[in-house]
Amino acid sequence: MPLYQRGDVRIRYEETGSGFPLLVTPGGGLNSRVSIWPTAVFNAMEVFKNDFRCITMDQRNANGGESTGPVPVDNPWEAFADDQLGLMDHLGIREFFYMGYCIGGCFAGKLLQRAPDRVVAAVFCQTVGHLPQDPRVMYRHGKENWVPDFIKGRPEVSIDMIEAYLHNLYAIQPDFLYSVSREFIRGCRTPILVLPDDVPAHPLQTSIDVASLAPNAEITVFPWKEPAELKNRTIDRVRRFLQARIPMRDAAQ
């Protein structure tokens, strides 16, 4: 299992296929890791491996994964972007597509902000976002589903650090995508495709807002997971959306 190291951060990644690069991260909140793919709504590493060079990774400090590093209390979304862009640098990749499931919608927003000249197109699949009726749902998810196992293996990390980390992830911008503002998405001209969901951690309104605000965004039908024929057409729409945006110099190769 390949790893890349940058200072005191170690990232485990996998890749398959060939063609224009597609960085794709699974769901799971702060436990986003490669081993989650078999339970995803669809396994992008499998369905797109004949179309793109598919790259995935364990996110930093995900329980059950092999990526480790400091807890970036002061700049958590920036740190995730550092890890993701650092992996692309390590692989010698300049331009790429990005597709993020669940928490990956927040990753997508930050990558689009940090590297607009590198992310050629982005797909938001069942993105997390702020839910006004339950504004602490993601904070609670992290505290219940990530913290207990994480602190068992990292006794040097204090509860105060963890509380500050979760606060800075989900309460600094307690609206929309957490990682970027509505104003940023409104001005983002990168092509975006949105696959909505409608559960407390993946509010339908967040997906609608991304698709409504971003000037070059599209959104699929909803619901799209059933029947199987509709789900397959939705997956093919993602494929065609990305293929149509491969830079000409790469498409000609």
Which residues make up each language-model segment?
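Catalytic active-site module of serine/aspartate enzymes centered on a nucleophile-bearing elbow/loop
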Residues: A217-Q253
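Short beta-strand/loop motif that positions the catalytic acidic residue
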Residues: C188, V194-P196
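Active-site loop/oxyanion-hole signature of alpha/beta-hydrolase fold enzymes
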Residues: F42-E46, T56-F96
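Conserved hydrolase catalytic core segment
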Residues: R94-H130
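Conserved HGGG/HGGXW glycine-rich cap/lid loop of the alpha/beta-hydrolase fold
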Residues: G7-S67
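The alpha/beta-hydrolase serine catalytic core
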Residues: L131-C188, D250
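Conserved alpha/beta-hydrolase "acid-adjacent" motif
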Residues: P200-T206
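Short beta-to-alpha linker loops that shape the active-site pocket of alpha/beta-hydrolase fold enzymes
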Residues: D58-A62, V128, P223-K225
